[in-house]
Amino acid sequence: MTLFRPSLLLVSGLLLSACAQGPQTLYNWDQYQGVVYQHMQGDDTGVEAQIDALEKNQQEASAKGQAVPPGFHAHLGMLYAQLGKDAQTREQFETEKRLFPESAPFMNFLMSIKKGETQ
């Protein structure tokens, strides 16, 4: 009987630890890395398909209460710029600046290029 009790505690402890969840990531990376990789490889995936994948990723992340990673909105803005959607481009760049203030100089630079303010 005395051997049974410690064994039971050990087994129940192992079962409970097996049910524990792993650490949560800071950002929802979902499809973002794959989309960027395809874009950099010059994959035949169209810009619209990349935008759709990133927008879906953003919706899923917000539904789960997770944040998208740094560069997400900047990349989405650059995809919008390729389609000539200036309002969406600016909105994404501003969102990137707001969420990640350290990106402000680069986002300002990209917005100034769009306006033709750089030489």
Q: Model-flagged regions — what are they?
A:
Residues 15-18:
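C-terminal motif of bacterial Sec signal peptides marking the signal peptidase cleavage site
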Residues 25-29, 67:
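Residue signature of alpha-solenoid helical repeat architecture, marking inter-repeat boundaries
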Residues 75-76:
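Structural register within alpha-helical repeat arrays
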Residues 20-23:
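Bacterial signal peptide processing site
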